[in-house]
Amino acid sequence: MFKEYKIYKFFEQVKQETYKVVWPTRKELVASTLVVVVAVFIFSLICLVLDYSIHNIMQLLLNIGK
């Protein structure tokens, strides 16, 4: 019985905490999402350039003796 009370108390506290959360407005959410998408795109381009560069360097090094 005490265990059931602890579980109930836990979920009651979770419910109380969700009322304290300050949820972002739609405008803030869109802005944050846009920042993440742009950051991922830029990071992907950096990875692409690095991968392409390393590939070309390795091809150059492997073809030196041929």
Swiss-Prot record:
Transmembrane stretches, start-end: 29-49
GO molecular function: protein transmembrane transporter activity
PROSITE patterns assigned: SECE_SEC61G
Alphabetized InterPro entries for the sequence: SecE_bac (IPR005807), SecE_sf (IPR038379), Translocase_SecE/Sec61-g (IPR001901)
Pfam family, one: SecE
Membrane topology listed for this record: Single-pass membrane protein
Primary residence: membrane
Annotated compartments: Cell inner membrane
GO biological process: intracellular protein transmembrane transport; protein secretion; protein targeting; protein transport by the Sec complex
One Gene Ontology cellular component annotation held by this UniProt entry: plasma membrane
Record keywords: Cell inner membrane, Cell membrane, Membrane, Protein transport, Translocation, Transmembrane, Transmembrane helix, Transport
Family, as annotated: Belongs to the SecE/SEC61-gamma family.
Quaternary structure note: Component of the Sec protein translocase complex. Heterotrimer consisting of SecY, SecE and SecG subunits. The heterotrimers can form oligomers, although 1 heterotrimer is thought to be able to translocate proteins. Interacts with the ribosome. Interacts with SecDF, and other proteins may be involved. Interacts with SecA.
PANTHER family listed in its UniProt record: PROTEIN TRANSLOCASE SUBUNIT SECE
Protein function: Essential subunit of the Sec protein translocation channel SecYEG. Clamps together the 2 halves of SecY. May contact the channel plug during translocation.
Protein name: Protein translocase subunit SecE
Species name: Rickettsia felis (strain ATCC VR-1525 / URRWXCal2) (Rickettsia azadi)
Upper lineage: Bacteria, Pseudomonadati, Pseudomonadota, Alphaproteobacteria, Rickettsiales
